[in-house]
Amino acid sequence: MVLVDTCGWIEWLTDGPLADAFRPHLEQTDALLVPTLVQYELAKWITRERDETLALEVIGLTQQSRVVALDTSLALGAAALALEHRLAMADAVIYATARAHDATVVTSDAHFEHLSGVTYLRQQTKPD
């Protein structure tokens, strides 16, 4: 199982520099885990940056995968991981969800870079 972080979805949606690296993970919907928190972040970002209709279409795409709601067990696990790794709430929930389901987090978010069970896709810096 793979959990693509919100930044990966946005990279793919905007055809950013790492879109091709995220694409294969997003296309394997039978092996893709989507926390409801990622759905929230996508809906908020897409509605703000584009429009609500596109946001609803993308949420529909996420529902072709295995959607995982935040429950008490995940919340407590996320709290422990946040304290252990100094993660923000959203990152901790995403990481806890992946760990609870034996999934690999695929992300370009540097907050995850040194965590186990993470495939970190480094953004290329432009030369000066």
Q: How should each PLM-predicted stretch be described?
A:
Residues L33, V68, L121:
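General small-molecule cofactor/ligand-binding pocket signal
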Residues W9-I10, Q39, F112-E113:
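A generic structural signal for short hydrophobic patches within well-formed alpha-helices
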Residues M1-V34, I46-E57, P127-D128:
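Short, well-structured N-terminal submotif of metal-dependent ribonuclease cores
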Residues V67-S108:
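Active-site neighborhoods of divalent-metal-dependent phosphate/nucleic-acid chemistry enzymes
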Residues Y95-D128:
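Acidic, PIN/NYN-like endoribonuclease modules and their adjacent C-terminal/linker elements
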